[in-house]
UniProtKB/Swiss-Prot annotation:
Annotated binding of Zn(2+), by residue: H171, H173, D184
Renumbered ranges of motif JAMM motif: 171-184
Domain MPN: 100-222
Record's protein name: UPF0758 protein YicR
Recorded family membership: Belongs to the UPF0758 family. YicR subfamily.
GO biological process: proteolysis
GO MF annotation list: metal ion binding; metallopeptidase activity
Keyword annotations of the record: Hydrolase, Metal-binding, Metalloprotease, Protease, Zinc
Organism domain of life: Bacteria
Amino acid sequence: MKNNSQLLMPREKMLKFGISALTDVELLALFLRTGTRGKDVLTLAKEMLENFGSLYGLLTSEYEQFSGVHGIGVAKFAQLKGIAELARRYYNVRMREESPLLSPEMTREFLQSQLTGEEREIFMVIFLDSQHRVITHRRLFSGTLNHVEVHPREIIREAIKINASALILAHNHPSGCAEPSKADKLITERIIKSCQFMDLRVLDHIVIGRGEYVSFAERGWI
C-alpha cells in the first residue's frame, strides 16, 4: 500500500494535466513504481537523476555505472533499458506509418532515437522517393569509436535497388561532440558527387552527438 500511495500524486497529476506536466523525477518514479527499503520512489528517482545528471545520462548508462547507486539492482536497470528501447521502437514505427518526414525536428528526433548511446560510429541512410516520402532507413556501415569506413557505391546500389530519389545521411559521434570532422565533410562531398551521376539528391547529413546535433543543410553546406 505504501508504494501505491507514493505513486498517487504523479498519477493524479498525469490524469488531470497530462503526461507532459510531470517533472523528470515524477515521470521516472512512475516507471520505477517502487522505492527501496527506507527510501520512497520519488526520493530514489531524484537521487538517480542527480547521480547521472539527466534522463539522457541515466538511459544511456551501462549496468556497471549503477552499482554505486544504492537500491538499483538488475530489475530496475532492466526497466530503464526497456524504456529506452521502447522509445527507439516507437520512432521506428512512427517513421513507417507517417511516411513523409513531417519536419526537420521529427527527422532529428528519429535519428537521435536510433543513434544515441551507440558505442561505435554508425552510418545510416534514410531513403526517400521523389515526393520525399520515406521508403526505408538502413544502417549501412559500422566502425570504431571515432571512425567509420563509408563507401558511396554501396549507398547508391541500395538506393537503386529500392528506387529511391533522395537521401538523408546520418552518423553518430560516440564521443558526444557532434561537430563534423574534416573527414565527415570530405565523405559527404564524395557521396553528393557520386549521387549526382545517378540523379540522386542528398538532402542533408546529420551528425548526432550527446544531446546535440549538426545538420549540414542548416549550416549551408548542402
